[in-house]
C-alpha cells in the first residue's frame, strides 16, 4: 500500500533519527564484547530511574546495530531503523516482504529490554520462532540479553525457566495457553507466565485479524449422545432449497416455515423451539451449517478418515484443532467418518482479549494498511507504511476477466506455458485445494511439469518454496505460498523478468491478494503479477447485488465467446466492491466475536482475580462464617414472604443445604423454627466445629474446597454460556438484538454461578467431621 500524509510525516520525523544512528557507526566499533555488555548494563540501570530521550535511543540503536554487524554480518539500513522506531511507538509497521523485518525486530526488542520490560516476540508458527530465535537471539545474547524459545510440550519447571528470560520467542497460541493454564493451577508456585509487558507480533495481520475468529480453548471430553449427529444428518441430507434460507457470506443458515414443519415431523416433536426439543434443534442447525456453509477442500480436508480444519488465510491444515460447539462433530457425520466426542471448555480466551492485556503491543507485517480501521478500533494501533530500501521493480497488470472458469483455465495454461518455455519461474496462487487440483489437472494435460503446495502436502512446504525461484519452475500453491520464507531467484532468472505471479481468483480480502503479489519483486528484483479471474468465481457468485446480476446476465448473453478477457471498468469496480463488502462482513464477524467474548472476558477477569488472591494468601479472602451466614439467610426466609409457586423450590434448597451434613438439628425440627433462629444455630454450630481445627489446617481445607468448587462451577458456567450463545440467535433472529439478550442473560448466569459455588461451599462447611476432613 502507498503511504498517506500521516505516514510520510512520521517517516520524515524518524528518518533524521535513523540517519543519526547510522552516523554513530564508529561509536562502538573498537569495543570488545565485554565492553558492549557493560554498555547494556549501563542503559538498564539508567532507565530504572530516568526517562529515555531521543539521544539515548540513537546510542542504544547504534549499539545493537554494531552487534548485528559483527554476529550476523548485517548492517541495518535507514528504512529498517525507521520501522523499529515506529514499532517502539506501539504501532504496526507495514514493511514489504524481503525488506528485513526480522532484523528490524532486534532494535525494538533491545530497547524495550533496556526500559526494563520483558519482551514476547510472537510468530506465525514454531518453525519461524525457532529460526528467528537462532538468528536474532544470538545478537541479543552477545549484548548480554537473555533469550528463550517458548515451545509446546514443556513441563512446569522448563516453562518457568523460559519465562525468566528478557526476550521470549513463541506462537500466539502457546503464550495464550500458558495464560489459561496459569489460571487453572492449584498452587501459586505452579504459575509460569510473568508480567505481560511488551509484545511484538510478526505477521500481525495474520495473528491479530485472521486468527482472531478462532478462540483459544483448553478442553476435555464431554459426554453426550453422538448418535443424534447421524440421525440429524439423515434429515438434512433430504432437505431441499425450499426448506431453508441462507446468507453464505455471513455464514448463517436457518429453517423457514417449510423446513420447521419437516424437522418437527422428522423428530416427532410438537414444536422444534420448545425446551424439550433443544438438543434436536441445536444438532439440526449444526448439520445444516456443516452441509450448506462448510465446504470440503475449502474449509476442511478429510485425510486418513479424519476431518482437519483448513486455515482460510494460509491454506494450511491445522492438525489437533477442531471446530467448537459441535460443528466438528456435524462435519464428521456429514463426511461419514467417526464422530468423536465433543469437547467441554475448561478455559477460553480470544486472541484479541489475550493480547489486549499487554501493557504495550506492536506489530510488523507486509500487509496491514487495508485493515487499519480494525487495528485502530480493536487494538488502538495505527498502521504506518515503511518505504522500501530499493524501488519495487514488479510489473502489476490489470486483471484479466473471463466469462467462464473454463475460459479462464485455458488462458492460465497459455500464460504459464510461454513463460515456462522461456524459463521464467511462475507461482500460481489458488484460494482452495479444489481449485488447486483443477489447475494442476489442466497443467498436466498441457504437459507442463509443476510442483503443488496445498494442505494435503504442507509438510514439504519449505522444500517446495526453496525451489520456486529456480529457472523454469512452475509452482501451484494455495494461500500459504510459504509466507515468512523468501523465494530466492536463480541468478540467471533476473534477465527473464524475475518471478511471475498469477492469481487465479480474487480473495475475500485485498490483503491476501497483496500478499500473493508480494512474493515477487523483492528487494528490487524484477517481477510480474496478474490476476486471471472469471464471472463464475466464488467471490462474484456470492456477491449479492441486483445491479451486478443484471450486468452479469447481460455480459453472458451478448458478449462474444472467443475466450478473450473482458476489459470492463464496471466489472473491475464490482470486483473491488465485492471484496470491500466481504471484508466488511468478516470484520463484523470478528467484532461480533469480540463483543460476545467481552461479556465472558469481564467475568473471567473477576474469577481469575479471585483465584489469584486465593493462591497469594493461601486462605479465603472473606471469612467462611460470612459466606455461610449469607447462604443461610438466603435459604431460610419466612414462608409467608415467598410466593406459593416457589415454596417447593425453597424447601428443596433448605434440604440440599443441610442434607447429609453433620448439622445436629433434624430437618423436621428446623421447619418448626424461626428462619433467623435457624441461621444463628447454623453459624454458631459451624464456629464451634471450626475452632476444633488448628488455624493453618482449617484455612488450607477451606481454601482447597472453595477453589475446587469455584473451578468446577466455572467450567459448568462456561458450558452454560456456550449453550446460551448458540440458542440466543435462534430465539432472537429478526427480533430483539441477540447481543443485548446475551449480555443480560449472561449476567444472570454469572450471578447464579457465584451463588452456586457459595452455596455448595456452605454445604461443605457443614460436612466438617471431628477429624478435620470434609466428607463428600
Swiss-Prot record:
One of its GO terms (biological process) is protein import. InterPro entries: Helicase_ATP-bd (IPR014001), Helicase_C-like (IPR001650), P-loop_NTPase (IPR027417), SecA (IPR000185), SecA_DEAD (IPR011115), SecA_motor_DEAD (IPR014018), SecA_preprotein_X-link_dom (IPR011130), SecA_SF2_C (IPR044722). Its main location: membrane. It is found in: Cell membrane; Cytoplasm. Pfam families: P-loop_SecA, SecA_DEAD, SecA_PP_bind, SecA_SW. One of its GO terms (molecular function) is ATP binding. Its EC number is 7.4.2.8. Disruption phenotype: Knockout causes a smooth to rough phenotype transition; cells grow as filaments longer than 10 um in length with septa between cells but no indentations. Knockout also causes a smooth to rough phenotype transition; cells grow as filaments longer than 10 um in length with septa between cells but no indentations. ATP binds at residues 80, 98-102, 486. Changing residue 553 to T: In strain: SLCC7509. It comes from the Bacteria. It catalyses: ATP + H2O + cellular proteinSide 1 = ADP + phosphate + cellular proteinSide 2. The keyword Membrane applies. It is an enzyme of class 7 (translocase). Keywords: ATP-binding, Cell membrane, Cytoplasm, Dwarfism, Membrane, Nucleotide-binding, Protein transport, Translocase, Translocation, Transport. Changing residue 407 to G: In strain: SLCC7510. The keyword Cytoplasm applies. One of its GO terms (cellular component) is cytoplasm. Changing residue 627 to F: In strain: SLCC7510. NCBIfam families: PRK09200.1, SecA2_Lm. PANTHER family: CHLOROPLAST PROTEIN-TRANSPORTING ATPASE, SECA INNER MEMBRANE COMPONENT OF SEC PROTEIN SECRETION SYSTEM. Belongs to the SecA family. Part of the Sec protein translocase complex. Interacts with the SecYEG preprotein conducting channel. Has a central role in coupling the hydrolysis of ATP to the transfer of proteins into and across the cell membrane, serving as an ATP-driven molecular motor driving the stepwise translocation of polypeptide chains across the membrane. Monomer and homodimer. Part of the essential Sec protein translocation apparatus which comprises SecA, SecYEG and auxiliary proteins SecDF. Other proteins may also be involved. This is Protein translocase subunit SecA 2. It comes from Listeria monocytogenes serovar 1/2a (strain ATCC BAA-679 / EGD-e). The gene is secA2.
